[in-house]
């Protein structure tokens, strides 16, 4: 997303690399084209229970002249456990830890078969104010619990387009909300 001649990035992930644990980001980065550098703009606010939040798989739109609305995306804990499972399984196999191997193989086999609610995709509409560097929680909306959705603001309405309800299952739904 480009605002005020800067590019903002939230989400993504780093897969297992050279036997290192994967990384799921919990921050927003800003790229300054004048200096060709990335810097941390802000850390995402944690959930009310203190759990980490990520915008991996989420989407964002500019709002007014100096705000960004962030929505959707995967649950940090569920996603990190899934993408880290191969390295944990390899370590369990190297240690000949049969209990861990059995558990991790069962988790991998079951991962795509859980009900939608199990994945806990993000339902919070977050607003980040670039002027004050402050986050606002604009509420919980089940329609935002998507990964890979598109979003657009037009005529004072936020439109959320499609997205995954859970891994591998996309919805054709288009939802709108008046801002």
Language-model segments: residues:
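Kelch-like beta-propeller repeat domains
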Residues: 1-179
């Amino acid at each position: 997303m480009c605002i005020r001649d800067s590019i903002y990035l939230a989400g993504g992930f780093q897969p297992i690399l050279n036997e290192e644990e994967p990384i799921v980001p919990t921050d927003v980065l800003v790229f300054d084209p004048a200096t060709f550098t990335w810097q941390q703009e802000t850390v995402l606010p944690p959930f009310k229970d203190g759990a980490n939040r990520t915008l991996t798989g989420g989407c964002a739109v500019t709002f007014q002249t100096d705000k960004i609305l962030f929505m959707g995306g995967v649950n940090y804990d569920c996603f990190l456990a899934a993408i880290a499972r191969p390295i944990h399984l390899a370590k369990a196999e190297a240690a000949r830890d049969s209990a861990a191997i059995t558990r991790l193989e069962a988790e991998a086999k079951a991962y795509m078969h859980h009900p939608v609610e199990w994945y806990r995709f993000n339902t919070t509409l977050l607003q980040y104010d670039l002027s004050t560097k402050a986050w606002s929680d604009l509420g919980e909306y089940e329609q935002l619990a998507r990964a890979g959705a598109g979003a657009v603001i037009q005529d004072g309405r936020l439109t959320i387009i499609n997205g995954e309800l859970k891994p591998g299952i996309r919805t054709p739904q288009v939802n709108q909300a008046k801002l």
